[in-house]
Every structure is written in structure tokens, then in C-alpha cells.
């Protein structure tokens, strides 16, 4: 019996989701610094994040660290068909999976620091929305700074940057340091309530009004 093809949006069956979680787990064991979590982000978290922005009117959306695509699919479902989605992912297995499952997305195997280069390649001066699933607290301080500077350089005055963190680590030194980096780079930051139905519970930082020039770190 032939299997029916996946929908264009990339929606998957329950068995496919289980397989996705298994792949994600083994990717974490192989590269914990770049994968950052034992399980992929949930559709519940994706919906909570995407409800905060207007993807339908966005012309260019960027996803940093899409992993296995838990948020990528919902992004494409909400975007206009003429919109551009750029995704930056270091894990090569995830890159190959994303390219197969979401052919509409432009998926690049490169570090998030290189985002401005890929925007220029597509003749885009700035992104309307940048969504991050990166494991910030697993990164050295210098890498966090480089990525955030690349994000700011890829935004305009109306752009939005969103990233999530797990609630149980928000008061740890690494998470508090990252929050300080955000405050130095954005004039407006909102933090959502805890999304308890995600595993583990998470919250979202919504950042606007990018501060273009950062005069060093204290």
C-alpha cells in the first residue's frame, strides 16, 4: 500500500512526530551544544509565539535554530505565499530534513552570525520578524554577543525579534546574563507568561526597537 504524501504545509502524523522526537534526541546526544534540548519545541509553544506577531503581512521572516521544524511548519502556514522564510541551522541532519519537509523555506547550513550575508544574498535589507530557537545558555558569551549583534544588524525600526527560554532556568546566572544582553540591544522587551503546557515550561522574550550600535559590554 502506498503512503499518502505529506501535506504542503509540512503537517505530520503522530508516528512522524515520534520519529522526529527520536531523531532530535539522538542529535542532542551527538551535538548537545548546538541542539540544546532533549526534545523539540512543542506546537503549543509555536502557537504561543506566533500569536504575538502578524506573519500574514510579513515579507521576510527568519528562523534561527529551527531544529526539526516544530515552529517552521506553523510559520509557513501563517505566512503569505509570496513571503520569504530564511532558516539558519548548524545540525546537518536537521538541515536535510527541513529541506525535504519544507521546500518553501530557504534553509542554510551556517551559523546565525552570518544572517546579514544571507539577507543580502536575497536582496533583503532587513527582516520583518526574527524567531530564535537557539540554545543561548549553552553558548559562550562571545557567541551570544555575535549572534545578537547580527540580529540587530538584520532589523529595522519596526522589526520584531522573539526568542524563548525555559522557565526553570530563568533565574540562573547564564539566563540572567542573556537577559542583560537583550536589554543592551533593544529599547522595548516584553516577556510572556509561562507556557505551562510546553515540556519543559517556557516563556517568550519579544524584543523591539533595536539599538543599532553597542558600545562594548560591561
Q: Which sequence ranges carry the predicted segments?
A:
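Class I SAM-dependent methyltransferase Rossmann-like catalytic core
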Residues: 21-56
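A short glycine-rich, Lys/Arg-flanked "PGG" loop and its adjoining helix->strand segment in the class I
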Residues: 145-157
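Class I S-adenosyl-L-methionine
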Residues: 176-218
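Conserved class I S-adenosyl-L-methionine
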Residues: 57-67
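S-adenosyl-L-methionine
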Residues: 95-124
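Conserved beta-strand signature within the Rossmann-like core of class I S-adenosyl-L-methionine
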Residues: 155-165
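Conserved SAM-binding loop of SAM-dependent methyltransferases across substrates and taxa
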Residues: 68-80
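Conserved SAM-binding motif I beta-strand of class I
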Residues: 84-89
Amino acid at each position: 500500500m502506498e503512503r499518502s504524501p505529506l501535506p504542503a504545509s509540512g503537517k505530520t502524523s503522530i508516528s512522524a512526530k515520534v520519529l522526529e522526537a527520536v531523531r532530535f534526541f539522538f542529535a542532542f546526544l551527538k551535538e548537545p551544544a548546538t541542539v540544546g534540548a532533549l526534545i523539540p519545541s512543542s506546537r503549543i509553544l509555536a502557537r504561543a509565539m506566533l500569536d504575538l506577531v502578524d506573519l500574514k503581512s510579513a515579507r521576510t521572516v527568519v528562523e534561527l535554530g529551527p531544529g526539526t521544524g516544530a515552529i517552521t511548519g506553523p510559520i509557513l502556514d501563517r505566512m503569505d505565499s509570496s513571503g520569504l522564510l530564511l532558516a539558519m541551522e548548524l545540525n546537518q541532519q536537521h538541515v536535510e530534513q527541513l529541506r525535504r519537509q519544507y521546500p518553501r523555506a530557504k534553509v542554510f547550513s551556517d551559523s546565525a552570525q552570518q544572517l546579514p550575508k544571507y539577507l543580502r544574498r536575497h536582496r533583503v535589507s532587513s527582516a520583518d520578524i526574527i524567531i530564535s530557537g537557539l540554545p543561548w545558555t549553552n553558548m559562550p558569551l562571545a557567541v551570544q554577543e555575535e549572534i545578537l549583534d547580527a540580529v540587530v544588524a538584520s532589523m529595522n525600526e519596526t522589526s520584531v525579534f522573539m526568542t524563548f527560554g525555559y522557565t526553570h532556568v530563568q533565574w540562573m546566572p547564564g539566563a540572567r546574563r542573556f537577559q542583560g544582553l537583550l536589554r543592551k540591544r533593544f529599547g522595548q522587551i516584553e516577556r510572556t507568561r509561562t507556557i505551562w503546557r510546553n515540556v519543559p515550561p517556557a516563556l517568550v522574550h519579544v524584543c523591539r526597537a533595536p539599538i543599532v550600535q553597542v558600545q562594548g559590554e560591561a
